[in-house]
């Protein structure tokens, strides 16, 4: 398993051939432009954990990725296009 800190709350987890991005927020930019993601996880709706301005481009660039987020983020950020998790 490889865990890469991409700034503030954002991490990239790589394990068993899978790439999972966690909390791509607005206080880090190094996640922008990432591709080949298998999953995107947003733990909660604060902007430092999900950047509402740029998340749509990330989701579009990783159309095959599973996207999961806290329920409030799912409702407040339509570009996230995520299924809610508890």
Positions of PLM-derived features:
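Extreme N-terminal starter segment of soluble prokaryotic enzymes
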Residues: 1-4
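Pre-active-site segment of Zn-dependent metallo-hydrolases
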Residues: 6, 10-45, 52-60
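Short, well-ordered coil/turn elements that cap or connect secondary structure elements
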Residues: 15, 62, 77-80
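Short internal beta-strands
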Residues: 42, 63-72
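Generic structural signal for well-ordered secondary structure
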Residues: 48-51, 70
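Phosphate- and divalent-cation-binding pockets in alpha/beta enzyme and binding domains
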Residues: 49, 57, 75-77
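Metallo-beta-lactamase
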Residues: 69-86
């Amino acid at each position: 398993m490889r865990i890469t800190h991409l700034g503030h709350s954002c991490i990239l987890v790589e394990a068993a051939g899978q790439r999972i991005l966690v909390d791509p927020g607005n206080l880090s930019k190094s996640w922008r432009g990432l591709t080949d993601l298998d999953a995107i996880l947003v733990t909660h709706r604060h902007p430092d954990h999900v950047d509402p301005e740029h998340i749509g481009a990330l989701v579009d660039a990783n159309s095959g990725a599973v996207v999961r987020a806290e329920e409030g983020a799912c409702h407040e950020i339509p570009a996230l296009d995520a299924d809610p998790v508890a």
